[in-house]
């Protein structure tokens, strides 16, 4: 289980992102993460914390001042450490997912055969958010890449992408996650 939150504002989005992500705390107990994009410095800022021994608020409140920007995404996840930040031919982006992918091992082997690599291992397993990001960057643009994800995965996936231009939200046709 898990839940995510995204926001775009004309002023700093940090407080909205913090409280919006915290609102999803009942959906997961393992990890929480937030990422913002600061257009002024052209930087993505990210933080991920383990929530198994403490609450989201406790883990993130002290470090809120480091987040800058008018757009951001956050997640409460029972699976992978997220968000992850990718630099690709599509541009830089942060991604969070809530997913249950039945054919993850098959897709992992296909991507490895294409000379792709996985850097975000989680408990010795492939981070499904990174796998989804690698499927996205196979597209000619974000829309084509997201369509590639939904053509290839067996299961369910909802996602938020934080790009330099804003937020892209997508879910599978069944909307199960």
At which residue positions do the language-model features occur?
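Conserved short alpha-helical segments that host acidic/polar catalytic motifs at enzyme active sites
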Residues: 1-177
């Amino acid at each position: 289980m898990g839940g995510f939150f995204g926001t775009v504002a004309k002023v700093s989005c940090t407080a909205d992102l913090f409280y919006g992500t915290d609102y999803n705390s009942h959906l997961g107990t393992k990890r929480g993460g937030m990422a913002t994009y600061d257009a002024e410095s052209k930087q993505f800022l990210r933080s991920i914390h383990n929530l198994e021994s403490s609450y989201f608020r406790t883990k993130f409140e002290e470090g809120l001042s480091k987040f800058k920007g008018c757009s951001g995404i956050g997640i409460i996840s029972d699976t992978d450490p997220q968000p992850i930040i990718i630099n690709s031919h599509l541009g830089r982006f942060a991604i969070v997912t809530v997913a249950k992918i039945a054919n993850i091992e098959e897709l992992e082997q296909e991507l490895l055969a294409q000379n792709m690599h996985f850097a975000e291992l989680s408990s010795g397993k492939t981070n499904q958010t990174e796998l989804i990001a690698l499927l996205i960057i196979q597209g000619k643009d974000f829309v084509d890449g997201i369509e590639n994800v939904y053509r290839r995965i067996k299961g369910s996936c909802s996602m938020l992408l934080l790009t330099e231009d804003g937020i892209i939200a997508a879910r599978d046709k069944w909307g199960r996650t």
